[in-house]
Amino acid sequence: MKHIKNEREEVFLEDDQAQHSQAELLSSKDENLQPSIPLSPVAFELDFSGNFQFISDNSSELLDIPKDKIIGHSVAEVLGTDGYNAFMRAVNCLLKDDSHSYHVRFQHSINANHANQNYYTAKGDLPSDEKITKPFDAIGILIRHPGSAIPAHTMWVVNPATNSLGSVSPLVTKLLDVIGFGASLLDKYLCDLRTSYHKHNSLDALPLPTPEFCQICEREIQSWFFELHSKFCLSTSTYESVVQAAQDSLLYFRSTLLEIQEGMQKDSSLVPVYKNEPLIVDADDYFFTDENKQTLSLCSFLSQVMYYLEVAIDITIPPVKIIVNFDKVDSLRVQSPRSEKATIELDNYNPSLENCSSAVIALWEDIKTAVDTKITGVLRLRNAIYYSERIRLEIDHHVQEIIDDVVSNLVTNHSSTSLGHLESKLAPSITFPDACDALEAEECITRPGSATNTPQSDRSLDINDLSRSSSYSRHLSHVSLSNPDFAIGSPMSQDSSNYSSPLHRRKASDSNFSDPRFDDLKYLSPNSSPRFVASDGPNRPASNGRSSLFSRGRASNLGDVGLRLPSPSPRIHTIVPNSAPEHPSINDYKILKPISKGAFGSVYLAQKRTTGDYFAIKILKKSNMIAKNQVINVRAERAILMSQGESPFVAKLYYTFQSKDYLYLVMEYLNGGDCGSLLKTMGVLDLDWIRTYIAETVLCLGDLHDRGIIHRDIKPENLLISQNGHLKLTDFGLSRVGYMKRHRRKQSSSIPVLDLRDRSSAISDLSLSTASSVLEAQSLITPERPKRPSLNEKLLSLDGTSIRLAGQSFNYENSAEDSPTATNTPTSQVDESNIFRSTDSPRVQPFFENKDPSKRFIGTPDYIAPEVILGNPGIKASDWWSLGCVVFEFLFGYPPFNAETPDQVFQNILARRINWPAEVFTAESSVALDLIDRLLCMNPANRLGANGVEEIKAHPFFKSVNWDTILEEDPPFVPKPFSPEDTVYFDSRGLKGFDFSEYYNQPTVTEAQKLEEERPASSIPQHVSGNRKGRLRSNTISTPEFGSFTYRNLDFLNKANRNTIQKLRKEHMAVKSAKTSVDDTFSQYMSRFKAKLSTSQSVGPVKSSRRASMADYEASTTTRVQDITTDSIDSIDDFDSLKEGRMLSFFDNLALEDHKGVSSTMSASQSQSSMHTALPDVTEGTSSDEHTTIQKGRIDNLQAQSLTHKRNAISYPGLFQLDRLQMIIPKDEIELAEILKKIFPKLTLVLIDDPWSILKKLLQNEQFNVVFLHFGNDKVSSSRLMYSVRTSATINSRVPFVYICEDETCIPTDLQSDGVLLKPITCENIESCLRKLDVWHS
């Protein structure tokens, strides 16, 4: 393995020509080996002997080396002698001076087949037996032990060697290996500085750096640092989620043990059970002495455990409140001294377990595993934060030096006044506040003295330090710890080190400039992390200047402490600390309108204030969830949705958070409604529709079953229609755990007991192996409530939860019968429904026999399988039964076991009394009937699908289905909303006119429940007192029932950041090649278009704003046909009266294909050439990628449309005057339109071909007099259309339908129509037809 020498002086001290040559070489050297998408970097730790003591799990992905072949091995064994020598030189340098980061470039051989799979090759795959030698960059820092500051190890992060896009100036070449492509963006900014100065000949006109919006931390980041920051941000957010999940687990432990103590105080005869063994044996039964009784007392043991848990819970990662000078970067601290002391105390804490039973030992080992998981996560998080801060500070420092050099060169010919200003000293030092916001006064770390009593060069605080406090994320969410997706880079020095060396930094006084505008700057503090830190911060004010989640925006104003321009050189601020709220809140969203109401919560359409993205927010009231015993349901649904983040079959979950009284699940907004609403509108579905929808549902359920998830609530209302027309499953509240065992609460009037079903069944299962790992809820079977335990049989059970953290499992044993993977789950024989166990607990009763309201089924019973009703454990076959009920309802319009009461429905299900319709079945439907019959088999073992999903796929009903491409085929229905805020396809189910202020007035959990200040771990009392119990309750940051309930879908946020990076690259390349971007071309065309309209009459602007949602980004390869409607209006000035909310066409969703399904209208003076689709205006500053769907052919089509008629303009629903006659006709019936306009001079015609557009038009509050149809509309039969309109409650429910055809005999006799218009179309035929309909005097 050949090691490339790293003498940074060879890079930095070459002449300009050599610099450009080297940059060009780097840009072309590995052209065929550059990753097409960013690969996750690898983080590892080296001891001072060069041995790996930690490496992230993605080592095999990037380096093609398994993790188990690295840990404990020497660098020489993995990277060869050259690699070992290089890293050891860097390690020795760090031990001597750790104020610098060190860079090592090495080469490593990768199997070609592995490289092909991981996108290393851009131009064809290489032979699988060939080796590829690829350069890598590693940058490391020294990590010290907390508290003692003794060197512990070195931390390194490895990335593929990067390069800029094209050559860069010598000034930024030294940053090339660090920020890669960002060096090109920095070089461009320096060019902008020079251009602006030469243009205005003034320092006051120098431009500010243009920031980019990080979707993870929601902050504005400099473009050249954005790619590196996004990796830092993702890595720290990953660790935060790990630590938060571990914190939740410890809180569950603590709450459980506390209630056990309370229960034992009220009834001392209770004996605990852990893993089916007595936790503390009865001393009398085992002839223990009095001394041993005291040693083995439960209270004493629990007190020790509570003390241990409390110390672990009190460990926090406080916010980085310290503003440090770069020369004092080693003073940066990211953890409070008390937390550091607590960590050391836990390491040395070993309680005496002598003479303890195996259950006691097992309990202690499980708790210790959870504690160790948190400690490990905290240490990793602390190191990641420290690492990212160190690298950011170095980059900021060197970038500022570069900017100062450029400005200094610009003003060399200026007056002596300017020169004198350039030579001014440091910016004013910052005055610190008297106390920190979140840390206790005694925890505030001693800072360097002010500039008044220390030398400026090393004690004063530079103004740049305002931005150098933290780059880590404010949110908690779930991503893998072991795949920290962050790249490292740092400038090096002109040191004589052979392989690695730091870059000497000039003193800050050499290049910093004072600015009186910064004299009164307030102290900045970034946000706390992780979420359980006891600190409060103000929420971010609403801002409309930021970009949409997947479209990069340009914020011109970053606030009072944002990017401001001290004179003469611009000051960079990589992070704007106050730009993100500390705690997610519903105030971050604008609730627009209700979508639907369910049994336990409501769903609303909302828009995120910072980005403009649209989401569906499910809001649940905590008190209702607890009262209705839905705690486990909520936690299970959240966990499942988190685990299905990449599934194309499940509605995506993006965020979860809570307030004092409510839970919020921010989900993907699927604007097509649900199949329940579709059925309500259509009545029944065609067989082709049924086949497609059921096939997609089969794929979805098969995928869930393969993952060990049983949905158990399959019904039309839970099948959502996405933007592209395909189905997605939602509402997993009843999944895994079953139905009836979730709807019972303990009814006890004596001893208060702990219901583990509400507390401990859904504790997170953390997988730390990949960045996409998620929290998996562990199931819990809860049998019927036991009777009051007898005196000798009272057992207090902790069993009921399985927790897996950091790959190490400890179990509160859970039953395997309802586990997602029963074969891998330990089985417990104890009753898990209660902490009390009795040997005479009753058997489970069927639902319909239960008279206790607390044990009756809550929800829709029509789709429940008979085995579930009988109380048997749920199996996968129960989902297939529900699917059979859905097929029946799709075909006939009602459930197969429908009855007036739930009890009757249950009786029908158990007796298999299917309510078949009386009509005669066709041969075509007989196959569907056979599918229903086999799915509704009473014996689960014989039910279709019991042996796997392939059984269902092989059924003749799906003979024409291509299972491999069904999700890529055109669906039967594609939603065409009028606007992004249109919810026309949803059935609100009574949720109307709700006052949203009830949600906005809710305080956050932290605001509602202030935590006590952090106490030294050593001060924790050894025994639990009454006051301590109360404090334990109040110190919980969130209700124990729901945990922290904080989650962010980092996978999608990271994709958004990567999308921004790709846009930056494309835009930079477009500028370099001097090509006109798509949006510039389109803007020019639109300007000509509007100019032509204005020659006739002035036209008011039609506003347009792009709000791309996550669903739009996910389905970016799919174009959606929009319902673009143009209606007749009297004057083009009516443009001014159009409302933006009724905009029917917005650019990011314009279709590329022909105007199928697009409706048009004609006024009295219009002809065929005048019919066209007018377009709204385009706001300036739109990114070119927003219009990637608008191809050249599309623009040509738009230009070809006629612009010659003065009265031709866009019209919108609601502008019709109801005193006029209105008709709908096919848009190709121009002859019919002209004749009708002659007959009815005041007639308004709406030209629509698409049946769905016709249906949507008729279902609005806009009256039509006649609907002309071509017989045999595609996909939706005429009878279906008529049925939907006739059964609706709109003003068009009795509108006449007239079919246009060549011969009246082609109309089936059983088709009920109001009239037939025969061709050729003449005035006489139309008059005859309409007279029969009595339309003349309408």
UniProtKB/Swiss-Prot annotation:
Domain AGC-kinase C-terminal: 959-1057
Gene field: cek1
Protein name: Serine/threonine-protein kinase cek1
Protein family (similarity comment): Belongs to the protein kinase superfamily. Ser/Thr protein kinase family.
Biased composition range(s): Low complexity: 1159-1174
Binding residue positions for ATP: 595-603, 618
Domain PAS, residue spans: 28-98
Protein function: May facilitate the progression of anaphase through direct or indirect interaction with the cut8 protein.
PANTHER family membership: SERINE/THREONINE-PROTEIN KINASE, SERINE_THREONINE-PROTEIN KINASE CEK1-RELATED
SUPFAM superfamilies: Protein kinase-like (PK-like)
Keywords: ATP-binding, Kinase, Nucleotide-binding, Phosphoprotein, Serine/threonine-protein kinase, Transferase
SMART domains in the record: S_TK_X (SM00133), S_TKc (SM00220)
Record has Phosphoprotein as a keyword: yes
GO molecular function list: ATP binding; protein serine kinase activity; protein serine/threonine kinase activity
Record region (Disordered): 484-554, 813-844, 1010-1035, 1159-1185
Record field: compositional bias (Polar residues): 491-501, 541-550, 813-842
